[in-house]
C-alpha cells in the first residue's frame, strides 16, 4: 500500500532515516513545519549559512521599507509567496494545498519591519535577529505566516537537499528535470529567480523532502504564548532597575481596578501584558535572549514533537493499514455507492479497533489521542486506496465536515469523525450532520464516534 514518500518512489524508509529526512505522506499534509530557530541553534555550517541568508533578506526588506519602497508592486515582488506545498507539511484541510502569503501579510510586514527589527545587525541584548520576532508583535503576522515565509526563504536549500538524495537513491524513472519558480534572490536585479532541479515527480508535481532536525510541531521555539506565560519572570530578570520598575508600574496600571482579595482573570492579565509589551518592546529582546541561551531545550523539544508525529502518522498508521489488510476486506469493497462504501469501511474500522487490537495504535505513551484533527488525518491516510474521491473537511458555506465521500456530483455521503470526549458532541449530533448534508447537497450522512473507556 502506498502512503508515504518511500512507498511511492520505491525506496527503503531506512535510506531516508540515514539521510535525516522525514518520510512524508503523499496523501495528506502532516502537522509539522520548519522552525527557523533550529537553524540558528545548530552547529551545522549549512544551517548557519541558511540562518544568515534569512537575515540578509530581512536586512534588504528593512532598508527598502525605510526608503519608502513598500508600494503594491514591491510588496507583490518581495513579500508575496505561494505556499511550498510540495513539502507536504502544514494544516491543509484537503491534500497539501494551503493559502500561502498574500498581500495582507505583505502590507502588515512591510509597514512594521522597521519596528520589529529595529536593531537588525546591531543587536546588543540578543545574539542575533530572528524572523519569528514578527509573530510577537500585534501586526497581523501569525505562526503560519512565519512558517510559509521561512520555507520560501529556505527553498533553494530544500531543493538542493532533495535533489542530492533523489539522484543517489531514487530510480531515474521517478525523476524529472523541473524549472522551479522563485528559488533564490538576486540582489543585483532585486528579484526572485528560477532554477532547474532534478526532483522526484508524481501526479504532475515535484516533491520536496525536509531534514527532521529543523522541524517542529505546534509552536516555534520563539512564540507569543511563552512570551505572555513567562512575562513576570522575563521582566524580573531585566538588570536595569529603572526599566524594570517602569515596566511593572505600567503593567499594574493596565490591570483593571479590583476589590480587595479579588483576583484578576487570565484574560485581564493577558490584555495588560500585551499593552505593556507594546509600550516596552524591549521586553521582547530579553525574552528572545533567554530563548537563545537554551538551544539544547529547543532541539530536545522539537525532536520529541517530530518523533510524536512520526509515531502517530507514520509508524502507527502503517501498522493500522497492515491490520486492516490482514483482518478485513477494507480495501476490497466493490464501489457501488458512496454510502455503502463509507458504512462498510467504518464497520471494518470498528471491528479492527475493538476486536483486533487496533485500539492500541490510537494510544501514545498510554494516553489516547486527544485531538480530532489527528483522528481525521489518520482516517484519510487509511482511506487512500478507495475508488471514491475522499475530500477532508470540505467547506461549502456551513462550516467544515470531516469528510465528503463522493462518486461524482450525484453520489455523496458526508462522514464526521468525532471523539466522545469532545465537549460539543451533543450539539454536533443534534445539528451539524443535518446542516452539512444540506450544504453538500446529499441525503446521506454518517457520524462515527471514537470512545476510549
Feature roles, as predicted:
Residues 62-65, 154-169, 346-356, 379-387, ...:
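Hydrophobic, Leu/Ile/Phe/Ala-enriched alpha-helical segments that form helix-helix packing faces
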Residues 184-385:
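The feature marks a conserved, polyanion-engaging helical scaffold used by nucleic-acid processing enzymes
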Residues 1, 351-453:
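Catalytic core segments in nucleotide and nucleic-acid processing enzymes
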Residues 1-178:
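Long, contiguous, compositionally biased segments that the model treats as domain-scale units
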Residues 117-135, 309-323, 407-435:
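Generic detector of solvent-exposed, compositionally biased contiguous segments
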Amino acid at each position: 500500500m502506498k502512503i508515504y514518500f518511500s512507498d511511492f518512489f520505491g525506496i527503503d524508509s531506512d535510506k531516508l532515516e540515514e539521510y535525516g529526512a522525514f518520510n512524508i505522506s503523499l496523501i495528506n499534509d502532516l502537522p509539522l513545519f520548519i522552525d527557523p530557530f533550529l537553524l540558528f541553534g545548530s552547529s551545522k555550517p549549512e544551517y548557519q549559512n541558511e540562518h544568515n541568508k534569512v537575515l540578509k533578506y530581512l536586512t534588504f526588506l528593512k532598508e527598502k521599507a525605510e526608503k519608502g519602497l513598500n508600494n503594491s508592486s514591491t510588496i507583490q515582488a518581495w513579500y508575496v509567496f505561494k505556499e511550498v506545498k510540495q513539502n507536504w507539511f502544514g494544516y491543509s484541510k484537503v491534500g497539501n494545498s494551503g493559502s500561502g502569503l498574500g498581500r495582507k501579510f505583505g502590507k502588515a510586514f512591510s509597514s512594521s519591519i522597521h519596528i520589529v527589527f529595529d536593531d537588525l545587525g546591531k543587536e546588543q541584548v540578543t545574539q542575533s535577529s530572528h524572523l519569528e520576532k514578527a509573530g510577537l508583535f500585534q501586526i497581523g503576522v501569525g505562526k503560519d505566516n512565519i512558517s510559509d515565509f521561512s520555507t520560501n526563504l529556505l527553498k533553494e536549500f530544500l531543493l538542493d537537499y532533495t535533489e542530492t538524495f533523489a539522484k543517489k537513491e531514487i530510480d531515474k524513472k521517478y525523476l524529472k528535470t523541473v524549472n522551479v519558480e522563485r528559488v533564490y534572490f538576486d540582489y543585483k536585479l532585486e528579484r526572485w529567480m528560477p532554477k532547474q532541479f532534478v526532483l522526484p515527480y508524481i501526479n504532475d508535481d515535484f516533491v520536496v523532502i525536509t531534514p527532521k532536525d529543523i522541524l517542529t510541531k505546534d509552536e516555534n521555539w520563539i512564540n507569543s504564548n511563552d512570551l505572555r506565560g513567562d512575562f513576570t519572570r522575563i521582566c524580573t530578570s531585566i538588570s536595569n532597575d529603572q526599566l524594570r520598575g517602569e515596566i511593572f508600574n505600567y503593567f499594574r496600571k493596565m490591570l483593571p481596578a479590583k476589590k480587595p482579595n479579588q483576583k484578576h482573570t487570565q484574560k485581564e492579565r493577558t490584555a495588560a501584558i500585551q499593552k505593556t509589551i507594546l509600550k516596552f518592546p524591549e521586553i521582547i529582546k530579553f525574552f528572545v535572549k533567554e530563548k537563545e541561551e537554551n538551544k539544547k531545550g529547543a532541539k530536545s523539544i522539537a525532536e520529541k514533537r517530530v518523533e510524536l508525529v512520526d509515531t502517530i502518522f507514520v509508524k502507527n498508521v502503517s501498522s493500522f493499514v497492515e491490520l486492516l489488510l490482514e483482518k478485513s476486506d477494507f480495501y476490497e469493497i466493490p464501489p457501488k455507492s458512496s454510502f455503502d462504501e463509507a458504512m462498510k469501511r467504518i464497520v471494518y474500522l470498528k471491528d479492527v479497533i475493538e476486536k483486533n487490537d487496533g485500539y492500541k495504535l490510537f494510544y501514545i505513551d498510554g494516553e489516547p489521542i486527544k485531538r480530532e484533527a489527528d483522528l481525521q488525518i489518520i482516517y484519510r491516510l487509511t482511506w487512500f486506496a478507495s475508488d471514491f474521491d475522499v475530500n477532508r473537511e470540505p467547506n461549502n458555506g456551513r462550516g467544515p465536515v470531516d469528510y465528503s465521500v463522493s462518486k461524482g456530483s450525484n453520489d455523496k455521503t458526508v462522514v464526521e469523525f468525532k471523539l466522545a470526549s469532545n465537549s460539543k458532541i451533543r450539539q454536533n449530533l443534534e445539528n451539524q450532520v443535518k446542516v452539512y448534508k444540506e450544504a453538500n447537497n446529499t441525503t446521506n450522512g454518517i457520524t462515527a464516534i471514537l470512545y476510549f473507556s
